[in-house]
Amino acid sequence: LDVSFLDSERGIAVGEQGTILFSNDGGSSWDYRDAPTEASSSKIIDIEFFSEIRAYAITDEGEVLKSSREINTAVGFLWNMQYFESEGGSSNLGVNLTSIEIATTNKFLLSGNDGYLSMSKDGGNIVTRQMIPLGNTTSFYDITMLDSFNGIAVGSNGSLLLTERSG
């Protein structure tokens, strides 16, 4: 359902039934990677190949997957569930996510249904829902940061939110 390239050669594609594919040759060939057991039957809907040390993906069921470079293993080979606590003390977001945007090595933003926009500043340990002026009837489809401070969230019924303060 999504693909993200770090450079002209290295890319990750994700999809139905926990599918994760990795390419080292610009997409000419793809190799399967194992999704975490908890996500093996999930629809992975968005992927961000952020850097040589980190990549994140999300499922439509509110799960966040993370791949980090380890001693002798490049990013994209091993995937783990990102367990986190939201402000309500929950260990699962419990929302249908639609997109993830990586702003820095440790900061990412999430969008979803029912007016859901959230941010993590610590790599996903704590996820904080953001206050929005539109109420909970707007579904957000995508969020992108233009630079370190300015970003746009796009939602249902032509909704468009801008931030000038990093989310």
Q: Positions of the model-derived regions?
A:
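Residue-level hotspots at or immediately adjacent to binding/recognition sites across diverse folds
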Residues: L1-G167
